[in-house]
Amino acid sequence: MKDCIKIVFASAFVCAIMPGCQDFPDESKKDESSFVRLEEVAEILAMIPIDCNHMYEVHHAVSSSSGNGYDEEYTMRNLFISPGSGVGDSPTRGQTDYPEPLRDLIEDYVYSTKSAAQMDPDEFISALAESDIQIYWPFSENWDGETMPVVTFDPEDGSDVNTGYRLKVDDDGFRHVEEVVVDEEMAAQVPVWVVNRNSDAGYATIEMLRREDPDWGTGGGNIIVRPREAVRTRSEGSCKTLVLRDFQMNRNFDTWFAGASEFFVKIGYLEDFTAMTEAEMRLYDPMVTDFMIVVKRNQVGISQNLNAVLMTGWHEGEDKTENRCAFMITEDDGGTRTEWSTKAKVFVEGKSYGFEISIPLSSRDDIVWRGSLDYDWFDRLDGSPASFGDVQLTFEVMEL
């Protein structure tokens, strides 16, 4: 079984392993020559006659996304289909709340300007609405309710500074745009809309999972674990559960234009392993628990409480140091689908059993840490934080 969870807020014993990677086609891979460019969308937003009602629309959407556990973002998909709704909201929310939503201004502008160019307006609008492009509004909670935004875009080259367009309306109602230099310091002082690409809308946050299934718990000190069918148990030995209590990011992994950092915490193991023969061993499939954790930029250096189950059905054997799991932390940067092929092992009744584990990742991901961990290490560490590269994790071993 594979549990894939997205959590938003928002070292160890290392065994050298030579990873093997196999490429897979990725249908969601972004075409580098995308029909709709980030810079183009930023220019459109700077040219259309935005007023306070449109500001409130975007602010409501990014606030809703943040409340649903995502970053402060307003996707083009939501902007065109359900104005004012955030990531995680119902598709029908907000459709009648805005008599002249932002999408109408964008459509009017595109039809009036691109009809004269060698580009079909309908095709452009369709491509924009179906793209991964979004408006990211950092520090949106500081908006005073009236200041117009500076519009910029992610240069996607690692830069921390870019050109932006400041929207101003004079006392006589005359509207004009001035070109400015935008950095994160400016974004903390005045409203800045960053046109960038979404990378988290395809996953459910812990907040969304709690709403959909009360059995997941209510947060705080509760353990978040999906209800499961009864599992095989042994009469001898204790059965333990590994819980990831806290996660702390010690530096931002992406430029501020890209928004939050998305981490995948992956652990591969054999659950409730009781095989006594090679034939029985073939009946077991490795489990891969895969958490996506999104940490906002203002949460760097701050411990985030998760209380998420990583590994269940863990029985102590005669030699706990012989029981190993495969563990990896990556920071998502996209690319083609690959996998980390490695080995882990369990020790039962005096015998050591090795098994293959394939853990998925993307080709451009930053590998924060990967390796093999023995179960005894978790027992010895229990409750104390451990460093894994530039992140810090706190585990707890629970006996159930």
Question: Which sequence ranges carry the predicted segments?
Answer:
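Tryptophan-paired
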Residues: T274-E318
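Long, charge-dense tracts
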Residues: S34-S238
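C2-type phospholipid-binding modules
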Residues: D332-L400
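Eukaryotic beta-sheet cores, primarily in C2 and C2-like/PH beta-sandwich modules
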Residues: V265, Q299-E349
